[in-house]
């Protein structure tokens, strides 16, 4: 029976099953179908793997028929299993650098792929060898390399298998061995049985999936599997990572509220507000995860992070995590003060013209609402702009109803403010509450009636009684804003003035130098310099978009670049507005539900008894006050009005006043 095996020629070595057709023809029927693929190395290996699985062994005598031939150039070695074939190619043909026989060029069949490392060539050899240790846990399909499995797992991202949570006693029939032939994944993809696979743990880095039953043996981890994460993995690691990210945002929000209470930054500065909000936008805040209300803040019930899956050993679910209450928003006074600061920040974002200056572009009509018209038609949060403008304008009324003449461009030197554009600005120092000012105390001076330029320095802004917001603004946006139709933006860094002024100025100069008398007395070079000087000035100082000799392509390019910058600034502006709205809704919801400690009331009650002993400690002084009835009657109404403020000083003053006439 061994003669047919000895007479096989090397040309037929590409079909390992064809060598065994002579002594077991009635048992196997698939080799005639595979023998036609001997010309191509890739198809030969694929057919060999298919034939090895399509003909399941009946007894132990049929095992030697599954030999796999090595198609390396000049090699006719045969291996019984794909694992041994892979080890043979890696050790015999690839070699190692330590043994001085390292070969980084693949010579399998007609392949001549060259790599730079041994790990790369060994990973490439998996393409030729029918070794598929990496199996998909969702469909059961096997792959040769871990990167192929990673790409395949991404195809299951939108599959309902990832979203559907399994029942406790259910099994997925498509995942276990045997498969579901109706879906096209036959048992051919699972041909590595435990008896044939001496290294079953090569491709299972995560062990059995958590919804498997516990009768499967545990498998050790292997770093070659890679970092493949599934949506069904609701284990401790995923829950811990989610908890850590939520806690980082939670701590950042608490620190932000603490900075507001301690006035670490100026709420009237658009640059400071934008920089402070930028740190919150990059984190996953618990407020933004579940709508305007926080997910972990009030802690009405324990929140379980992690768990949810059915592990093989029946482990208990992960413990519930609790986030402590915010230390900076415990009392009612804290909530009220923080809400006032947030309102100032909201007014700064909506009505301050520094949002244009800090971005370096002039955004027409973005921060100015005239009557019932609203020019902020894109990238605006729904139903927030008109109420915000209304509240920002009316909130400054009860404090100090002194209208500040405000120029939307912020350039009274070139564009004088008109009465039609003036409105009460929420960011003006005279309209801010006296309890929340950070700027110098001389706000009520006469200079506070005039708005400041965005290009003003810090010393100028402080001397004028305005916040230092303008120090962060570049000296730009010196142009008109009434281009409401085309919404044109101008880039910063160049001076801009109106077009009629630029055209009218050179014309009388040209007419004055074109006289015949001047031409006779003046050399011909001076008339050439007259029209060249305005061009040089316009090229260096004036925006090229306003000069008549500018190239149209450059003008379009400049306008397009400015438009892109303005759109990005619009997106950032909208994100800041939405974040402020979320924070204000969160504070308002806590105030409405009464979710705050009673420390504020306790402190007020505790202060009144302290005031009493202070008064009783001065009891020696109150005895002479009780004797004259004339001094006691005017003291009671004053003490009844402000009993908490100065109880001791009033007693001393009254005692002194009562003794002085005597």
UniProtKB/Swiss-Prot annotation:
Residues 7-43 have a biased composition (Low complexity). GO terms for molecular function: DNA binding; zinc ion binding. InterPro entries: pacC/RIM101, Znf_C2H2_sf, Znf_C2H2_type. Keywords: Activator, Cytoplasm, DNA-binding, Metal-binding, Nucleus, Repeat, Repressor, Transcription, Transcription regulation, Zinc, Zinc-finger. Residues 498-523, 597-619 have a biased composition (Basic and acidic residues). Belongs to the pacC/RIM101 family. This is pH-response transcription factor pacC/RIM101. It comes from Aspergillus oryzae (strain ATCC 42149 / RIB 40). The gene is pacC.
